[in-house]
Amino acid sequence: MDLKGKRVSVIGAGKSGIAAAQLLARKGATVFVSELGTMGAEEMQHLREMQIPFEEAGHSPAVYEADFCVISPGIPPHAEVVTTLQARNIPLYSEIELASRFCKARIVGITGTDGKTTTSTLVHALCEEDGLRNGYRAYSVGNIGVPFSSMVLDMKAGDIAVVELSSYQLERSPTLKPEVAVIMNITPDHLDRYAGELQGYAAAKFRIYANQGAGDTLIYNEDDALLREHFACRDQFPFNIMSFGMEPACKGVPDIRTFFLEGDTLVAHTPDGDEPVLVTSDFLKKSFRGRHNISNVLAAVAVAGALGIQREVVCQVIREFRGVEHRQEFVMTINGVDWVNDSKATNMNALRQALEALPATAVLIAGGRDKGNDYAAITRLVEKKVSLLIALGESQDKIVSAFKDVVAVKAAGSLEDAVLLARDAASSGQTVLFSPGCASFDMFKNFEDRGMQFKQCVHQLSSW
């Protein structure tokens, strides 16, 4: 991609926007950064250091003086700046798309509603260990928090870039071509962006394989009904297909590669027969538990199979894995009560998985900015698993109304109050589970900030 002499506007000055602007400037483009809100001092300093002009608190006409634009994923498709750019036929690309144009490394792309961060982290750990033995480097970038653009120029042929991909990022990545693509699952989420339609959300996820061909591999979750139906006619796709699942329908089918659970053993099924990989007791622990995490491990093992990573490496890395921060993260035990931070649970499916993973009953802290949640879908599970539900945030009234007839419910005015209520209610042997099931932006900067504040509150309890 030759950028010399090209004028490029970057819309949005978050981490990915700044990284994109820096990459564009290094490649010779004339760059302009435009931020609708207020920019931080650090972001402005980064741009000044590279003499990149910018604006904040609005988008001026200068934005439209561009050959193409790189747009931050959080900007909705109906935003005025987007519709104006489209009306002027100015191409819009994601930061992922931009970086991929310069990527010499092999790309492993991982998407899905839930599980993609844990799986991406695990796949990166597998590649990192394998790379130490075989002379390549592994990078973890994308939606996981490190912009692809900030690392891509360091990547060499033979390296592996593990790229976590959101639906927003995939929307505007028309030439992205992962060597290995993974779809973890597709359940209702972000439907406000897709006119309330699951099909639109799924279509964005399916863009991950749009450019794959012979020699590339698509890995999907056989347990997900939507994915199972979508990939039922494998012959219509030009790439290799592998699957994983607890009890996949293709188990025992010749010429199919799949990874499944048989009893407590993870098994690789190939045309040559079935081969046990490892048992769940090797990796399930207090800090990494639940059937959904078995699914995440199966996905990572499938990627290892596609990349040719040896079983010895797979077993070593998975046995040592301790989970990911804010994903059912064990914080500590206080007076016999386990405290678990699941701040990343921003939708109903993630909350359901957290409840299903509980070894005993729990005090549940939930709530935040509602995303059109259907709480009726988990009513029976809450009744079975929860002794007290503490409702928090903008969705507080909706949660109280949804569950007041099946479980004791209390409302909390702040996260600190919620933690104190949970402390007073929980008994030895129980868990206090912070799994909001909602977005964080009503009270916090993001889910990471929300999780950190929860952990701080818990640590303060232990010092009293």
UniProtKB/Swiss-Prot annotation:
<feature type="binding site">
    <location>
        <begin position="112"/>
        <end position="118"/>
    </location>
    <ligand>
        <name>ATP</name>
    </ligand>
</feature>
<dbReference type="GO" id="GO:0005737">
    <property type="term" value="C:cytoplasm"/>
</dbReference>
<protein>
    <recommendedName>
        <fullName>UDP-N-acetylmuramoylalanine--D-glutamate ligase</fullName>
        <ecNumber>6.3.2.9</ecNumber>
    </recommendedName>
</protein>
<keyword id="KW-0131">Cell cycle</keyword>
<dbReference type="GO" id="GO:0009252">
    <property type="term" value="P:peptidoglycan biosynthetic process"/>
</dbReference>
<dbReference type="InterPro" id="IPR005762">
    <property type="entry name" value="MurD"/>
</dbReference>
<dbReference type="GO" id="GO:0008764">
    <property type="term" value="F:UDP-N-acetylmuramoylalanine-D-glutamate ligase activity"/>
</dbReference>
<keyword id="KW-0132">Cell division</keyword>
<comment type="function">
    <text>Cell wall formation. Catalyzes the addition of glutamate to the nucleotide precursor UDP-N-acetylmuramoyl-L-alanine (UMA).</text>
</comment>
<keyword id="KW-0436">Ligase</keyword>
<keyword id="KW-0547">Nucleotide-binding</keyword>
<comment type="similarity">
    <text>Belongs to the MurCDEF family.</text>
</comment>
<dbReference type="InterPro" id="IPR036615">
    <property type="entry name" value="Mur_ligase_C_dom_sf"/>
</dbReference>
<keyword id="KW-0133">Cell shape</keyword>
<dbReference type="GO" id="GO:0071555">
    <property type="term" value="P:cell wall organization"/>
</dbReference>
<dbReference type="Pfam" id="PF08245">
    <property type="entry name" value="Mur_ligase_M"/>
</dbReference>
<dbReference type="InterPro" id="IPR013221">
    <property type="entry name" value="Mur_ligase_cen"/>
</dbReference>
<keyword id="KW-0067">ATP-binding</keyword>
<dbReference type="GO" id="GO:0051301">
    <property type="term" value="P:cell division"/>
</dbReference>
<dbReference type="GO" id="GO:0008360">
    <property type="term" value="P:regulation of cell shape"/>
</dbReference>
<comment type="pathway">
    <text>Cell wall biogenesis; peptidoglycan biosynthesis.</text>
</comment>
<dbReference type="Pfam" id="PF02875">
    <property type="entry name" value="Mur_ligase_C"/>
</dbReference>
<dbReference type="InterPro" id="IPR004101">
    <property type="entry name" value="Mur_ligase_C"/>
</dbReference>
<keyword id="KW-0963">Cytoplasm</keyword>
<dbReference type="GO" id="GO:0005524">
    <property type="term" value="F:ATP binding"/>
</dbReference>
<dbReference type="InterPro" id="IPR036565">
    <property type="entry name" value="Mur-like_cat_sf"/>
</dbReference>
<keyword id="KW-0961">Cell wall biogenesis/degradation</keyword>
<keyword id="KW-0573">Peptidoglycan synthesis</keyword>
<dbReference type="Pfam" id="PF21377">
    <property type="entry name" value="MurD_N"/>
</dbReference>
